[in-house]
Amino acid sequence: MEGVLLFWKYRALFFLVLCSLVLCKVHLSQASPTSQQHNDAASLSKIYPRGSHWAVGHLMGKKSIEEYPYAYDEADRSSAAVFSEGDKPSDGYQQWKESLLNLLKMIEVNEYRNSKAMREASVYNKKFSGAEDNNLKEMLDYLYQMMNMKENTSS
């Protein structure tokens, strides 16, 4: 129940986050190739069977050991740490979580300020003066008399 209330309270924010995630997913996904693109790729592979020749010469023999994801120790192939200490994948999740919590706190503070200003400036909190109170009593008395007259004439 609390999750539903939280969702309803921040529905605009959740909608914004959902839309941005969908747009990011659509932007990063690959489009399916058309038949013309497929034919172009097939014809290029026939011309250059080993790939693009323009980048072959200057990259030959320049593989770096630091960039290779595996470390070799006595012919044992074990995975090396690809991420440094500060770049763990969970840190990205923690950063997103912290930023969303900060955003929610800012929205909450903003809503509190707006509601406080509305309560202070509200017409409903205004006390009636003596003249307005008398006018209200006169109006209610007149309405009561009209209702009594209507009941008397109908019977």
Swiss-Prot record:
Pfam families registered for this protein in UniProt: Bombesin
GO terms of biological process kind: neuropeptide signaling pathway; positive regulation of peptide hormone secretion; positive regulation of phospholipase C-activating G protein-coupled receptor signaling pathway
InterPro entries: Bombesin
Keyword Nuclease attributed: no
One Gene Ontology cellular component annotation held by this UniProt entry: extracellular space
Maturation propeptide residues: 128-155
UniProt keyword list: Amidation, Cleavage on pair of basic residues, Cytoplasmic vesicle, Secreted, Signal
Gene Ontology molecular-function annotations: neuropeptide hormone activity
Signal peptide, first to last residue: 1-31
Tissue specificity note: Brain and stomach. In the stomach GRP was localized, at the base of the gastric pits, to occasional cells whose distribution and appearance were consistent with that of gut neuroendocrine cells.
Keyword Signal: yes
PTM-bearing positions, type Methionine amide: 60
Subcellular location: Secreted; Cytoplasmic vesicle, Secretory vesicle lumen
PROSITE patterns per the UniProt record, alphabetical: BOMBESIN
Annotated disulfide bonds: none
Family of this protein: Belongs to the bombesin/neuromedin-B/ranatensin family.
Function: Stimulates the release of gastrin and other gastrointestinal hormones.
Name recorded for this polypeptide: Gastrin-releasing peptide
